[in-house]
Amino acid sequence: MNSLLVYQALEEAAKKWPQSPAVYDEYGVMTFEELFKETEDLKHTLLNLGVTKGMGVGVMACNSRNFISGIFSVIGCGATVMPISHQLKKAEVDDILREANLHAIMDDKHGVCPIDKECKHIPMNVEAFRFAFTSISKDEQFASHVTNPAFIRFTSGTTGKSKGVIVSHQSAIERIESANKVLQLGVGDTVVWVLPMAYHFIVSILLYIKYGAAIAITKDFLPKNIQKDEFGNYFL
């Protein structure tokens, strides 16, 4: 799986900075080593369920450590992942599934149930995912016209009908390398995250992971809920 450059970004971060904080959230601090281990465990669960290279899988969740693990675990299987906001209405989710021809969808139960099928319950260290395959044949390859696809995201649709954009592993890494030449983020930096991860994963969350910056995930946007101790650690 040497071609899975996006997954390697997390794996390499765990090797370089195993005890450095990757995520601050309402459950405490999660190190890069812990984030990678939980992602690996979820990846193997998905592989055992039948997720594999050539598939498209949606991950619908709120801003959370599990959303990050979910995105990377799908990519680690060799599949293409679509980050989906948990705030979408059922009709909007139905449109996405129909337009994107995803093979499966996994969600954290914080939004509508995305698919009317029997789902597999996948426990995480905190909370859980539910997973189900769609009616798309597993033999139908997803984004066959793109070399080494990693992400699919839909445009906002403000200038017309939403369109799916495929981003390859190579393109995703090139984007964040270019962005960080300006941002200069690295180990010891912490980004307080308030925007929807589903719409900003590639050039934000992936960038922070690759360069060792911690992500402080807020439950809401109120400054009073973001506190920092004398050591610079965030507690929400």
List where the protein language model places each region:
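Conserved AMP-binding/adenylate-forming core of the ANL superfamily
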Residues: 2, 6, 11, 19-50, ...
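Conserved helix-loop-beta element of the AMP-binding
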Residues: 101-103, 117-129, 172, 190-192, ...
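Conserved AMP-binding/adenylation subdomain of ANL enzymes
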Residues: 173-190, 197-236
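ANL superfamily adenylate-forming
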Residues: 107-147, 161
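Conserved pre-ATP/AMP-binding loop-to-beta segment of ANL
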Residues: 3, 19, 136-154, 161, ...
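Solvent-exposed alpha-helix faces
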Residues: 40-44, 160, 177-180
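Structural motif
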Residues: 60-62, 86-87, 106-110, 125, ...
